[in-house]
């Protein structure tokens, strides 16, 4: 394992086994689907997020997987501009939308898979045609919310 992979595994290990397993499988499936994408890791205050984009800049991220204490979400960074005939995308902001994943297999649901394809096609900056993306640890917040649910998290 490379140093960034070891560091990411440590971040993920702080979540419950169910969340860690789901999120890890989602990351693996997306990395296999778009191997040319750079994977940018942000271990932030509210969540652990891994963005998939064409380069090392956060502003060009197309998709992002976020680990929360009780769920894993797939974010579409330009989701407001996507066609959503099934109404699966959540969010009301001017740009970003997301879908909560209950299991990694949700990526295979036609409505989610189609949304991923659409996001990749409509990306402001497309992914490289070939190559192998890197895993980059971009930010680790000193202060973080608990990564496992507790009685005070509702």
Regions found by a protein language model. Give the residues of each.
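Charge-dense, helix-prone N-terminal extensions
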Residues: 1-154
């Amino acid at each position: 394992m490379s140093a960034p992979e070891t560091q990411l595994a440590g971040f993920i290990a702080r979540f419950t086994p169910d969340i860690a397993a789901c999120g890890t499988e989602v990351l693996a499936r997306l990395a296999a689907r778009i191997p040319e994408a750079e994977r940018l890791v942000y271990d932030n205050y509210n969540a652990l997020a891994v963005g998939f984009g064409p380069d090392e800049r956060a502003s060009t991220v197309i998709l992002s997987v976020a680990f929360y204490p009780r769920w894993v979400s797939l974010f579409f960074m330009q989701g407001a501009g996507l066609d959503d005939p099934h109404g699966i995308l959540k969010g009301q902001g001017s740009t970003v939308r997301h879908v909560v994943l209950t299991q990694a297999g949700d990526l295979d649901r036609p409505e989610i898979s189609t949304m991923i394809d659409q996001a990749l096609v409509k990306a402001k900056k497309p992914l490289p045609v070939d190559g192998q993306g890197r895993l980059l640890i971009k930010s680790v917040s000193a202060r973080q919310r608990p990564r496992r649910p507790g009685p005070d998290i509702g």
